[in-house]
Design a protein with these regions (language model features):
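N-terminal hydrophobic or amphipathic segments with adjacent small-residue motifs
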Residues: 15, 120, 143-146
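Glycine-rich, small/acidic residue-mixed loop/short-helix segments
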Residues: 125-131, 135-168
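A glycine-rich phosphate-binding loop feature that marks nucleotide/adenosyl-phosphate handling sites
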Residues: 13-19, 70-71, 87-95, 150-156
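An anion-binding catalytic pocket shared by soluble metabolic enzymes
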Residues: 1-60, 65, 81, 158-168
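Contiguous alpha-helical scaffold segments within structured protein domains
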Residues: 36-137
């Protein structure tokens, strides 16, 4: 199963139109008052070794920017994020990514508010967020559509899961 551990989704708009995917990039999972967000930045093909990715200064720096942005956003909401010191390797299909799971206790938090605070991560939009989004809009001659949009679900207990991005 190539997408084990991915944020999997299916959205059926009507009988003729469905949107499904399996993104390795989980923007937010909220279960029983516990948040998890997956920082995923720094990518290499399967032909490279995991050690080369873990030791790549460029990829580690990019990855740490994403980790720091997510933890800063969670702190700004009054939460106390926890994370491992070093990233792990996550394999998805033909790619390997640097991956850091970030967790926090989040009693009485609204999933849509949390997702809105975290989206877009620097892995999607860049840094600083507002300037990067403006720069991308001025350069890109196409609409990203659903590519950079989070997608997910919320249940009646307030638990949820949202992918950071997908493709149409």
């Amino acid at each position: 199963h190539q997408q084990a551990g991915s944020c999997r989704f299916l959205w059926q708009r009507d009988a003729q139109d469905s949107f499904f995917g399996a993104s390795p990039e989980r923007l937010l999972s909220l279960r029983n008052g516990q948040i998890r967000s997956d920082a995923l930045a720094g990518t290499a093909g399967r032909l490279e070794t995991g050690e080369s990715l873990l030791n790549s200064e460029k990829d580690r720096r990019e990855h740490e920017l994403v980790v720091q942005a997510i933890t800063d956003h969670l702190r700004s909401l009054g939460l106390t994020p926890r994370r491992p010191r070093r990233p792990q390797l996550a394999r998805h299909g033909q790619l390997m990514h640097l991956h850091t799971p970030i967790t926090a206790a989040a009693e009485n938090q609204l999933p849509l508010f949390l997702a809105g605070a975290l989206h877009p991560t620097p892995a999607v939009a860049g840094l600083p967020r507002r300037q990067a989004i403006g720069w991308l809009r001025s350069l890109e001659t196409f609409e990203r559509g659903g590519y950079a949009a989070p997608i997910g679900w919320i249940d009646s207990a307030g638990d949820s899961e949202n992918s950071a991005r997908s493709s149409e």
